[in-house]
């Protein structure tokens, strides 16, 4: 669950977000470039400071907590993989910076890797993977963290339409199985219509709910 009523100031505009998102809801975030879509996700994740207001995640006040203390995983358009680490290590680092996983954590890693189709690539380096495979690694790292809130900031926009659909279907499956709360920033609304519960548009510094075209 996400509840926020916050204000964030840029030099030329003040953003006021007032949202209540229920457990397990899947929300598409739309708006023109520069409207504040990424800022909304960064506020929830703790990467941007709140000027005033409150952010509550899963019933707890996280307005000023550090990003690593929040029940949130976030995936950006850039996959942010470490080029010198293997796929296994790039996934594992989402749990532990020293890569020293317990037996149970290793089992979970292997389970997530299998779910995203990476079982045969765990020993490879990112340079040996396709763009779609690299995004699967980044997604696996998010899912392994097993946080109840998943934030996606156009992570698949650089992929071709077929690969985007594959990734979106995979996300939809995980959200249903784990009852994850999802916020997805997208410019391809038609591709996610059948996978979301609500649309929120960021415009003129405000977050407004829009009707889903069916």
Curated annotation (Swiss-Prot):
It catalyses: thiamine(out) + ATP + H2O = thiamine(in) + ADP + phosphate + H(+). It comes from the Bacteria. InterPro entries: AAA+_ATPase (IPR003593), ABC_SmlMolc_Importer (IPR050093), ABC_transporter-like_ATP-bd (IPR003439), ABC_transporter-like_CS (IPR017871), P-loop_NTPase (IPR027417), Thiamine_ABC_ThiQ (IPR005968). ATP binds at residues 31-38. Part of the ABC transporter complex ThiBPQ involved in thiamine import. Responsible for energy coupling to the transport system. It is found in: Cell inner membrane. The lineage of its organism: Bacteria, Pseudomonadati, Pseudomonadota, Gammaproteobacteria, Pasteurellales. Residues 2-212 form the ABC transporter domain. Disulfide bonds: none annotated. SUPFAM superfamilies: P-loop containing nucleoside triphosphate hydrolases. This is Thiamine import ATP-binding protein ThiQ. Its main location: membrane. Keywords: ATP-binding, Cell inner membrane, Cell membrane, Membrane, Nucleotide-binding, Translocase, Transport. Belongs to the ABC transporter superfamily. Thiamine importer (TC 3.A.1.19.1) family. It comes from Histophilus somni (strain 129Pt). One of its GO terms (molecular function) is ATP hydrolysis activity. Its EC number is 7.6.2.15. One of its GO terms (cellular component) is plasma membrane. The complex is composed of two ATP-binding proteins (ThiQ), two transmembrane proteins (ThiP) and a solute-binding protein (ThiB).
């Amino acid at each position: 669950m996400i509840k926020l009523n916050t204000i964030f100031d840029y030099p030329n505009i003040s953003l006021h977000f007032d949202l209540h998102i229920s457990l397990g809801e899947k929300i598409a975030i739309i708006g023109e470039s520069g409207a504040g879509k990424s800022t909304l996700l960064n506020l929830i994740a703790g990467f941007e400071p709140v000027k005033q207001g409150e952010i509550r995640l899963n019933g707890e006040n996280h307005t000023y907590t550090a990003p690593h203390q929040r029940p949130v995983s976030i995936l950006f358009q850039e996959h942010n993989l470490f080029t010198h680490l293997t796929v296994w290590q790039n996934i594992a680092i989402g749990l532990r910076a020293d890569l020293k996983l317990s037996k149970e954590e290793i089992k979970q890693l292997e389970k997530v890797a299998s779910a995203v189709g990476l079982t045969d690539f765990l020993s490879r380096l990112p340079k040996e993977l396709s763009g779609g495979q690299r995004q699967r690694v980044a997604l696996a790292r998010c899912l392994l963290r097993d946080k109840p809130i998943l934030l996606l900031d156009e992570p698949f926009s650089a992929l071709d339409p077929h690969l985007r659909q594959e990734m979106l279907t995979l996300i939809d499956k995980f959200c249903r199985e784990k009852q994850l709360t999802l916020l997805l920033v997208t410019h391809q609304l038609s591709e996610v219509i059948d996978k979301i519960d609500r649309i929120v548009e960021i415009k003129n510094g405000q977050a407004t709910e829009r009707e889903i075209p069916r």
